[in-house]
């Protein structure tokens, strides 16, 4: 059974302590230039991890990813004239 996972972006003051982020979830990406890390963890533990991370001295701020809540399947609503134009060529 798969668990639902959600990402969070952790903005850091310095990258020296970036290894300490491993205990909060899977570290997916660390940007050296912009000083942030993307971490994935279980959705059930997200709030607890965000509270712990924001209390650490080397963390500027923590933002959750909203990707699980965004609708990824779109419906196309074409009017009859455009639908006819698309079918003419075939």
Swiss-Prot record:
Signal peptide: none annotated. It is found in: Cytoplasm. Transmembrane segments: none annotated. GO terms for cellular component: cytoplasm. It comes from Bacillus pumilus (strain SAFR-032). This is UPF0298 protein BPUM_1393. Its main location: cytoplasm. InterPro entries: DUF2129. Keywords: Cytoplasm. Belongs to the UPF0298 family. It comes from the Bacteria.
